[in-house]
């Protein structure tokens, strides 16, 4: 995961501001003992991707219903089952991650999240329960998928949080578009954060996703992201 944001001083400052908060959050959560019941993983499968309800830090990707061909999803399910217990830097895991990246950034499907009305609504929904159900540490709303890194609050499960995000935004997006039917894909990916290096890698991955996908150049920030929101707020304060 390359960091392309360090070339511009303004972008570097934005990223540093975010990382100070993110690293403090990781330090606070790391103080919880390993035998604390809040740290114990709980698995959910329901015939789809296995999901780990893990507190505190989770990296989540969820997608529009038509963003990935169905046959690819079926292949991912089997590979995820096989690789779930392997080390994250295992070549098989890295190859799978590269293939997933390819489909995420290829712009398959109708890409409803390109509509600024919908991207804005999805971001507002993400921030609505900030500090209540979770703390959003980093996020990026791409044309056909969303990446989020959150610190889950005690008493809340990932499945509850995901339902809250997707049910409301699907309903509102369909109203905006004047359509009915599926909006989000049922399956989603989640990974718990193992350590500070893993967290920083994930943050760099999220921050750089619009650049990698060719949506912006390296001197700009994607508006529907944690960096974009921070940039907008910095601009408001300087005016």
Regions found by a protein language model. Give the residues of each.
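Short catalytic/metal-binding and nucleic-acid-binding patches
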Residues: 1-239
């Amino acid at each position: 995961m390359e960091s392309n944001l360090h070339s511009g001083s303004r972008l570097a400052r934005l990223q540093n501001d975010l990382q100070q908060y993110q690293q403090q959050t990781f330090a606070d959560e790391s103080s919880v003992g390993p035998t604390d019941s809040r740290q114990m993983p709980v698995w959910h499968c329901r015939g789809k991707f296995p999901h780990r309800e893990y507190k505190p830090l989770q990296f989540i990707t969820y997608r529009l219903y038509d963003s990935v061909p169905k046959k690819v999803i079926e292949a991912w399910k089997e590979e995820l089952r096989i690789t779930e217990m392997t080390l994250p830097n295992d070549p098989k895991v890295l190859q799978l991650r590269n293939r997933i990246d390819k489909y995420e950034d290829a712009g398959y499907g109708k890409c409803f999240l390109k509509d600024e009305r919908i991207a804005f609504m999805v971001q507002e929904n993400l921030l609505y329960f900030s500090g209540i159900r979770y703390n959003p540490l980093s996020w990026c709303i791409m044309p056909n998928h969303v990446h989020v890194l959150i610190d889950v609050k005690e008493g809340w499960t990932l499945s509850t949080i995901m339902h809250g995000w997707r049910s409301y935004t699907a309903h509102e997006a369909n109203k905006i578009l004047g359509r009915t039917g599926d909006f989000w894909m049922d399956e989603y990916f989640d990974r718990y954060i193992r350590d500070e290096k893993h967290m920083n890698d994930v943050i760099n991955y999220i921050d750089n996703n619009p650049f990698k996908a060719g949506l912006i150049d390296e001197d700009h920030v994607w508006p529907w992201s944690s960096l974009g929101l921070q940039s907008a707020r910095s601009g408001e304060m300087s005016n």
